[in-house]
Amino acid sequence: MIKVGIVGGSGYGAIELIRLLQTHPHVTIAHIYSHSKVDEPLKLTFPHLQHIMQHFEALTVDNNDCDVIFFATPAPVSKTCIPPLVEKGIHVIDLSGAFRIKNREIYEAYYKETAAAQDDLNHAIYSISEWQSLDNNGTKLISNPGCFPTATLLALHPLISEKIVDLSSIIIDAKTGVSGAGRSLSQRVHFSEMNENLSAYAIGNHKHKPEIEQYLSIIAGQDVSVIFTPHLVPMARGILSTIYVKLSSEYTTESLHKLMTSYYANQPFVRIRDIGTFPTTKEVLGSNYCDIGIYVDETTQTAILVSVIDNLVKGASGQAIQNLNILYDFEVTTGLKQSPVYP
């Protein structure tokens, strides 16, 4: 059995890691770390986990017996705590943005904090699970993608790689539930502020914008910029990303649907919807699925892609476990076969 540790154990990302890893046949949760809740029973923070008798612990590097440690922490914590563990030879899967952006200047411009050391950035593997191979011996630090980038990149990757789009025309209109903001209190997620309300935020300066652009640029082999506008909606969890992109070749809905279906034929967690149907966030709730609906406006030759995920599963903890499976050469669906919770 692989001994796993979870850092940031009192946050939403950690809750999902605990829930999902309980059913993983090759994993045991050896340690749950939280610097603010050391020695407290897990069930005191999460009453729905009454059946788990573990206590929060303080993270240590010396004598740490984990094979893999998941970090579900803010980026500054990851930047400080992860390098010594990697140096010790422990596999680390980081759910923060600390190691996603390879250009330190761009990171500092968007995150408003000092970037990780360049050596650490160079060694971190940014892993969208659907097309990343990981070497158990060579890969020590996996940078798990963000939630908005996951939903967006899964939809755009086939079109960019097939070179059928006008790269200057990409518009991403994305909606997210409030769990994406974490458990920390802020005025904009108070019930009276959020309920029956819809708001755009971080226009032009969201941390996920350079992450999306960085990866699209790698696929395209040239610099790619996007217009990305996120919105906060009054629901607990879920992301719906509507993407508009001009096609440089003539396509119909049918021909683009065929391309997308073929591209993801062997990827169990990407479900391309039938023509004329478009996914909703509830239809992937609690699951590791990404559902994508496709339409081509033939008059303007514009592709409209609707991509939905659960931000806490496919957008965070589920993809992290998927990366664990790839790292250890397990079946990719191991521990992740849960159907969506509906209604």
From Swiss-Prot:
GO cellular component: cytoplasm
Keywords: Amino-acid biosynthesis, Arginine biosynthesis, Cytoplasm, NADP, Oxidoreductase
EC numbers on record: 1.2.1.38
Catalytic activity: N-acetyl-L-glutamate 5-semialdehyde + phosphate + NADP(+) = N-acetyl-L-glutamyl 5-phosphate + NADPH + H(+)
GO molecular function: N-acetyl-gamma-glutamyl-phosphate reductase activity; NAD binding; NADP+ binding
Record field: transmembrane: none
Example GO BP: L-arginine biosynthetic process
UniProt pathway: Amino-acid biosynthesis; L-arginine biosynthesis; N(2)-acetyl-L-ornithine from L-glutamate: step 3/4
One of the Pfam families matching this protein, by short name: Semialdhyde_dh
Entry's localization field: Cytoplasm
InterPro entries xrefs: AGPR_AS, AGPR_type-1, NAD(P)-bd_dom_sf, NAGSA_dehydrogenase, Semialdehyde_DH_NAD-bd
Record-linked Gene3D superfamilies: Dihydrodipicolinate Reductase, domain 2, NAD(P)-binding Rossmann-like Domain
Active-site feature positions: 147
Sequence similarity: Belongs to the NAGSA dehydrogenase family. Type 1 subfamily.
Function: Catalyzes the NADPH-dependent reduction of N-acetyl-5-glutamyl phosphate to yield N-acetyl-L-glutamate 5-semialdehyde.
NCBIfam families found in the cross-reference section: argC
Annotated protein name in UniProt: N-acetyl-gamma-glutamyl-phosphate reductase
